[in-house]
Amino acid sequence: MREIRFGLYISLALLAIPFHPLHAGAVANPGGALPVVGDAHNKLIPVAVKGYDGEVARVLKFDLEVMGCKIVPEGAAAYLLAGGNRNSVNGILKDAAGNFEFNKRYNGGNLRQQAHALSNDVIKAITGRNGIAQTRILYKMKTGPRAYEVFVSDYDGHRPVALTSDNTLTESPLWAPGNGEVFYTSWMKIGGVENTTVIRHKMKTGKRKVFSRVKGLNTGGAVSP
């Protein structure tokens, strides 16, 4: 079984790479501290969801529950999300009195990404706050006896993409401001010599540069705002 280890930076604050909005007027999560809609001071929001099946139904349920909703039968709901996911995801949100909040259809990306976008729009309509369902997270994963690689994935662990394939120890992956690049510490060999090295890695191109490799310990790369 592969072990996924999330560093402290993920436990306390998620920095986001917003997924590009799938509809006009959408506001992507700008990143920063993880907004917990249903924290200890708030009651869970009763929402009924109908008309969806398969993976889309599971994604909507997961997203909405993570962001502070409770999925309930229609008769007990403060809000009803109704729609479908044949070919693309669509959704109509209305409150218990029948007042419409929105009626949207999503294009672009796959059905899972469209479901995440719909979840965020539901939270935005109900609470006025941006959701986290399109957040991307950065972490390291053990891939061998003495090897950890850096990965990025959706916030729910799906769509993982390996950023490194160095087959060596890797530590402390960290987003740079703006989320266009990341820093991490690698025990890579250069010229046959293994030494801790802070790497600067550009997300768009995959290009990376040695940021710090002085003799001794190089670790914990961070960027000032």
Question: What residue spans do the PLM features occupy?
Answer:
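Bacterial N-terminal signal peptides that target proteins for export
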Residues: M1-I10
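A structural "domain/chain start" motif
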Residues: H23-F62
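Beta-propeller blade-edge and WD-like acidic-aromatic loop motif
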Residues: P145-V161, T185-V210
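Conserved beta-propeller blade repeats
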Residues: A125, T168-T185, R208-K209, R213-P225
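Residue position within the beta-strands of beta-propeller blades
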Residues: R136-K142, E181-T185
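Bacterial N-terminal signal peptides
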Residues: Y9-P18
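Amphipathic beta-strand/beta-sheet edge segments enriched in Tyr/Trp
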Residues: K61, G75-D121
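Interaction modules related to DNA damage response and DNA replication/repair
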Residues: A57, K61, E65-A77
